[in-house]
């Protein structure tokens, strides 16, 4: 029971991922959230943090273009909504993980 409690508490913690100044508008950085490779993206003052793996074929999304509120997998063109992780263009049919993001005092934090 103690192990389960500690695991649940850890999962709810905010993790520091980047300084706001390290991610220019339109930029992105690779980060780790909850031991998962993730991508932190910035659009104006908004930050998004998504799992950095295409659910279709496991390709990293790191170099994919951002368009129409989503990120495009550079391999087969699947697009995922940055807010929800939902696939919005084939061939992907499964969502990717999206992490909650919070900005405090010039620092960006994320959590599952």
PLM-predicted stretches and their roles:
Residues 54, 73-76:
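Short cysteine clusters
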Residues 90-91:
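A conserved active-site-flanking secondary-structure segment within enzyme catalytic domains
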């Amino acid at each position: 029971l103690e192990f389960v409690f500690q695991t649940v508490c850890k999962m709810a913690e905010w993790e520091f991922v980047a300084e706001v100044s390290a991610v220019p508008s339109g930029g992105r950085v690779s980060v780790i959230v909850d031991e998962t490779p993730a991508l932190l993206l910035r659009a104006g003052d908004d930050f998004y943090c998504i799992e950095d793996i295409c659910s279709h074929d496991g390709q990293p999304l790191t170099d994919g273009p951002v368009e129409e509120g989503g990120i495009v997998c550079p391999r087969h063109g699947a697009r995922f909504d940055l807010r929800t992780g939902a696939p919005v263009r084939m061939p992907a049919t499964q969502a990717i993980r999206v992490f909650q993001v919070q900005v405090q005092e010039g620092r960006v934090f994320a959590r599952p």
